[in-house]
């Protein structure tokens, strides 16, 4: 094989890798703007997922700079979004993603909300469960 043909074949092979990477497992991005809203999006890359999730966050009424990138998992797996509130008032969301099944996601949430382990919580509940394609599993 001539050097010229080798270079053409090598160039074609290298050019195919970025396209192949986009066909890999999707990830899931979570963004939260405290007291305002949030966003959840699937993406081939963290940049793609977070860009979409920030857009959703802004559409919910938050300012762009208030939309905090909180979680990225690739592959996405099953995800669970948990609301927690401290007895002194502060409240927040905890997200666990990349889990192998819905049952494990719900079990993880149950452990996170175990009041015998976190007796300072006055409220802790699952807000949403997402399947590996980013589809919501709970009615809103």
Task: Label the predicted regions.
Residues 1-8:
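Bacterial N-terminal signal peptides that target proteins for export
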């Amino acid at each position: 094989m001539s050097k010229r043909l080798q270079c053409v074949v090598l160039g074609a092979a290298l050019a195919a890798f970025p396209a192949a990477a986009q066909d890999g497992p999707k990830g899931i991005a979570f963004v939260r703007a405290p007291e305002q809203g949030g966003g959840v999006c699937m993406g081939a890359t963290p940049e793609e997922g977070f860009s979409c999730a920030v857009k959703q966050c802004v559409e919910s009424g938050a300012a762009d700079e208030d939309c905090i990138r909180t979680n990225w998992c690739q592959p996405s797996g099953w995800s669970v979004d948990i609301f927690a509130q401290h007895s002194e008032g502060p409240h927040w969301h905890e997200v666990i993603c990349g889990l192998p099944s819905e049952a494990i996601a719900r079990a993880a949430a149950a452990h996170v909300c175990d009041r015998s382990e976190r007796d300072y919580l006055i409220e802790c509940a699952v807000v949403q469960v997402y399947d590996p394609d980013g589809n919501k599993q709970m009615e809103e």
